[in-house]
């Protein structure tokens, strides 16, 4: 890490910290009545959404499940040789599933046939990592040295590796750039997908892990201090706001000008990307991973092994009423 800091001493780590911007006291998650609750296994985690499906992983069984958003029913389950432990990604007509097998591995699920197509001998560096797809490749941190690998989706071959700060685990792809949070630090690294060159390191809140892209920015959910950092994708300038949600786990997604986050005990938070303002929070049981699509929030309850479908319109309507937790 010291070597990387020296190499990029000419790059400013720009961070503007804003005070909490909470529009209302936390509400109860029970006010959001699910349109459907789908039981998947002992635990449910990780959500990926396509134009015609919602995919969610489980343990007990080790599997990924395809849900039809038209009927809110599970229409396929694909058994896996181990736990899906580091996110899900969509690309090249496939669902990509990092597995905490021994040794770790990468599953490729065919989105057309709903079948396990391949298991590649490359896998995630750690649980709670992530995976991304972009520029025709799969992107994954593959070891504790934090080598970011670009993987050939056809055969699982590693095409290139880029050394990042140790403790970096979670990538996302946006605008021909791979962004990777430094979960054991307080920064995010931008990598040019075409050249493999590190082009920026930007300060964030403490222990950023899960991240998403939208509104010309990268958004990091920071586990160490319960904050959210917005990094301008062009200027690399950052602004951090308080969410009051520190802790392990969690997830983040962007849709239609809004950022949604989830953490255990605070299953849902809503942030306006235009103002960087925390509009509403819902507290209570459940939460841990989410996806936004098909006019719905797909929210897992990890320990219950379920995923709920909550209408975005319902959440927005309740938020506009500015009620309080009860």
Where are these regions (language model features)?
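Bacterial N-terminal signal peptides that target proteins for export
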Residues: 2-12
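Predominantly soluble domains enriched in secretory-pathway, periplasmic, or organellar proteins
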Residues: 16-326
